[in-house]
């Protein structure tokens, strides 16, 4: 039975860069999708974030973090561990076409997590406005060495106290 109530969640949207490139065959795409699922699951576990709701899109994942998890406490370790998993994956795949690079977008707002998917305005903002923004695409394409680029919404920045921007280190994680 659907739930109508929305609560405030940190919503993280992750999308694989150029997942449908012509040189990526179906077996390679499937391997990449499986690896991404493992990377995100491991990152959530290492960050001690339990009971998150996830939607697997094939070449990406949408995550609604539990509402009781403070935004900054959740995001910093999650992004760090996703970056660690990406670096490990990419170092162990000699073929460039099997390497994974991600666009990550984050919003804080209303969401309704179901057992296997998430809905709500926070997801729409993270996906439609941020994840597909040219700013985020340019940030990732402008540095071929970094495994991901991260963009947070104005609301997330305001509520979490990240106003003024966040400095990312050489490895694409907060320092």
What do these predicted ranges mean?
Residues 1-73:
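Catalytic NTP-binding/metal-coordinating core of nucleotidyl cyclase/transferase enzymes
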Residues 68-171:
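Catalytic beta-strand-to-alpha-helix segment of the class III nucleotidyl cyclase homology domain
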